[in-house]
Amino acid sequence: RLVIKENHLYITAGERGQGMIAQDFTKHPGSIIRINLDGSIPKDNPKFKDKKDWLPEIYQIGVRNPQGMALSPFDNKIYLSNHGAKGGDWFGTVNFGENYGWKILGWGGTNYSGTKIGPKWKPGFTKAIKYWVPSIAVSAITIYKGDTFKEWNGDALITSLKDQSLRKIKFKDDKVINEKIIFKGNIGRIRDIK
């Protein structure tokens, strides 16, 4: 997934089933990458601040399988949806120099074999806004802005593959106020939303 914010390109890179590689800040899998639009490296990326050992283009680590990414026109934050393993899908924010914890954390899910991965969350790692256990196979995300459903402005609309649903999440200060299923199972797996 790609997002442009303030002349920077943010790129997601899944961990491709390699697990702990998402904790390796010298490799791209399991990370969020941030570069300038001309392909050069921003001099305010984490490597040039307090993460001296990180690759210069890495902005955040510890994601498993990012599915959607969207820039909010309301708070200028980048929001992300991510597949867990067997459970542990989540919706959260992209944050400078932080770590979502895959595969130290399991976000509430388990390995496909049924064995435990790790805790849902623990201090020192980025906490998601919303987790789904069991997995709904989150996919695309957008932050709604428009006149058709004015009361939805600022809410996240998230699609689902496995659950075949469109969900609306009202949230504030990184906390869910409510989640509503707009529809489910009507049109099959939903990959994208605009």
Task: Give the role of each language-model region.
Residues 1-4:
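Asp-box/WD-like beta-propeller blade repeats and closely related beta-sheet repeat scaffolds
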Residues 15-180, 188:
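Beta-propeller domain segments
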